[in-house]
Amino acid sequence: MNIRFFCLIKEDIRYWSYLYHIDKCKFFHLFIRFPEFRCLLKMRLKCGEQANSSFFLKILRILVAISCRYHNCFIYTEPNVIGKGLLLHHAFATMISAAKIGDFCHIYQQVTIGNGGGGIPIIGNNVTIYAGAKVFGNITIGDDVVIGANAVVTKDIPSHSMVAGVPAKIIKKRFCFKEAWKKYEDNI
């Protein structure tokens, strides 16, 4: 049995429940109310296929497959390289093919992440990609990055940046408390 598979689903449920203020019957509430959660669950279940063939997981796979049929959210990334707490907002007409997606990322509708000139992107932790953005190629998006709506990203983006435009340019560096504290400690 793949423990990581269950830990990731548990963390997804915890994070989604926190964001949407769900206190009771968390899994069932998320499963019924959010088609985006079902798409994420479908992707996570791919990872669990090799790990467990229990009756419950077989039934869950069938329910998820039926419910995700009409939502047009395609995740081609291997399930084991997507971090915990991935949040898909209105994830319709969304295509995701990344080498890695970090923890607690937010991806909005009509986002395309994929191949462009010989490689696929690596997405860091706490990245937010707004509606209609495109992220292409063998690039790295650092931690705590915000990609604006309809931006086209084809080059590496350093951590703690906010980018927008076609092609995407850094419009603001975001404050990082951890880095500031580390610099402070180094100077003492």
Q: What are these model-derived regions, one by one?
A:
Residues 1-71, 180-188:
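Terminal amphipathic alpha-helical/low-complexity segments used for targeting or macromolecular assembly
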Residues 69-164, 168-171:
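Structural signal for interior beta-strand "rungs" in well-ordered beta-sheet cores
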Residues 165, 169, 176-181:
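Eukaryotic, compositionally biased intrinsically disordered regions
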